[in-house]
């Protein structure tokens, strides 16, 4: 399912126009992104938790040349599925 299909599903499920469903989805995405940028996690009980983890710097290798290089530390967004979501999928 892509974003436009998700908007269609939200519009049908919530009996909203597609434009309103699209704005609602965009607002959710912006809110989650903003919270993660601020260093907070977003917990949706039963669905899952969005969080940011720190990935330390490491040594990598260019596969074409074999030369080693340092890969900088980075922040990595993550998602851990909640119990209800896991049960619904299985």
UniProtKB/Swiss-Prot annotation:
Pfam families assigned: Bac_DNA_binding (PF00216)
Superkingdom, natural source: Bacteria
Keywords from the named record: DNA condensation, DNA-binding
InterPro entries: Hist_DNA-bd (IPR000119), Histone-like_DNA-bd_CS (IPR020816), IHF-like_DNA-bd_dom_sf (IPR010992)
Coiled-coil portions: none
Name of the molecule in the record: DNA-binding protein HU-beta
Gene3D superfamilies per UniProt: IHF-like DNA-binding proteins (4.10.520.10)
Subunit structure: Heterodimer of an alpha and a beta chain.
MF terms (GO), sorted A to Z: DNA binding; structural constituent of chromatin
Family membership: Belongs to the bacterial histone-like protein family.
GO biological process, one term: chromosome condensation
Lineage: Bacteria, Pseudomonadati, Pseudomonadota, Gammaproteobacteria, Pseudomonadales
